[in-house]
Amino acid sequence: MHSRTIWSVRPISGCWANPDKARVTVRWVDVQKAEGVRSRLVARDFKGGDKDRDGLYATTPPLESKRLLISRAATRVKGKLGRKLLFIDVKKAHLNPKCQQDVYMELPAEAEGGPGMCGKLNFWLYGFRPAARAWGDHYSEKLEHAGFVRGNACAVLFIMRTGICR
């Protein structure tokens, strides 16, 4: 977290100057995994409101899109075996997109800064309501920049102009 500068330390006087801004707290969540315990700093964004429900969730592909990918990968093309189908798991996905809003949080106890300081987010943390959608938008932007075209029927299905589904 320190190498990525997920947040910038600021004086509290500037963080909550706007009375409409809720004070966002954070806490560590430990999960037992096969390789040991994984700790994750999670925001407790309870008072996000329901003003913009469309922006809360990342887009996910419908089952039909997954079936299309698998059938395209398994289909023989000009006598050759099907294509490779690879899946990836992006580690710390929510920490990749930059935070485009002014979002302030209380610092965890072990963070630099001490009392009288808060953190302004540079990148999203798990637990913030818009984080999943921001990751989906960030990922889509990277694919489009790499030459993929967004599908017409499914916005999360990307196709390379050469005809290869990705």
Task: For each feature predicted by the language model, list its residue ranges.
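Chromodomain-type histone methyl-lysine reader module
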Residues: 1-141, 145-152
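Short, intrinsically disordered, charge-balanced linker/junction segments flanking boundaries
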Residues: 161-166
